[in-house]
């Protein structure tokens, strides 16, 4: 009788714990994650969570970079760990390794928005580390702006570029492709060596995939300060 009672109690506890644990979904099935772009290098989601709302418990199976759009105050509930409260600034960019599931709770009165960039070649980079970049961290003072190389992970290098009206990023070469994330509205002019000038116009929160193999200068042709994040690949 005692054995049966003990088994019943254990079963009830297991059922209670199961009921208290949110069911886990893939990131592609999480309603706040909207697929914006996908290729062999990246899978990019535009993320939006309403004020005082939360995502579903979802799993990150790839290392990823996220770019915050607008100031944010969120609670990060990682499965199996205590909740952590985080304050983020507009354009703040971070790298996180994969292998966890979490819920993101928006604690503010404004929508929480970010761009989540999954690095699709992370496992390959773990097995065989890619060549080092010529520079993996550093701040460059430009003519009317700054270029801040933030970090290099999994064969990808992230940088923040800020240009005042008329500010210029000097001539540089893109051997591989790169992703552009517009933190502000962008009205840029790209002067490509051997091809001439072209416009780059994006709204805040837009993303653009650029193929490599070209050399150019980049100028803020607009009347407002321009801020963007680039994630480039070798």
Provide a role label for each language-model segment:
Residues 68-69, 104, 116, 163, ...:
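Short, well-ordered beta-strand segments in beta-rich or mixed alpha/beta enzyme
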Residues 65-68, 93, 179-182, 207-210, ...:
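Active-site scaffold segments
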Residues 1-4:
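Positively charged n-region of N-terminal signal peptides that target proteins for export
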Residues 58-62, 102, 106, 172-176:
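His-enriched metal-coordination microenvironments in redox/metal-binding proteins
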């Amino acid at each position: 009788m005692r054995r049966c009672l003990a088994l019943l109690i254990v079963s009830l506890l297991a059922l209670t714990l199961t009921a208290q644990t949110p069911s886990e979904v893939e990131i592609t099935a999480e309603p706040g994650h909207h697929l914006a772009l996908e290729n062999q290098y990246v899978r990019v989601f535009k993320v939006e969570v309403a004020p005082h709302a939360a995502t579903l418990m979802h799993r990150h199976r790839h290392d990823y970079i996220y770019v915050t759009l607008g100031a944010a105050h969120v609670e990060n509930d990682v499965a199996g760990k205590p909740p952590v409260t985080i304050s983020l600034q507009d354009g703040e960019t971070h790298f996180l390794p994969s292998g966890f599931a979490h819920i993101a709770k928006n604690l503010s009165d404004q929508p929480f928005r970010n761009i989540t960039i999954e690095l699709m070649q992370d496992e390959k980079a773990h097995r065989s580390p890619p060549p080092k970049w010529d520079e993996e961290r550093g701040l460059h003072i430009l003519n009317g702006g700054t270029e801040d190389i933030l970090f290099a992970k999994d064969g990808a290098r992230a940088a923040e570029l800020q240009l005042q009206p008329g500010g210029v990023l000097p001539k540089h070469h893109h051997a591989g492709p790169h992703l552009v994330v517009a933190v502000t509205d962008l009205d840029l002019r790209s002067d490509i060596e051997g091809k001439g000038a072209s416009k780059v116009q994006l709204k805040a929160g837009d993303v653009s995939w650029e193929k490599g193999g070209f050399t150019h200068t980049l100028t803020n042709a607009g009347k407002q300060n321009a801020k963007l994040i680039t994630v480039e690949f070798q």
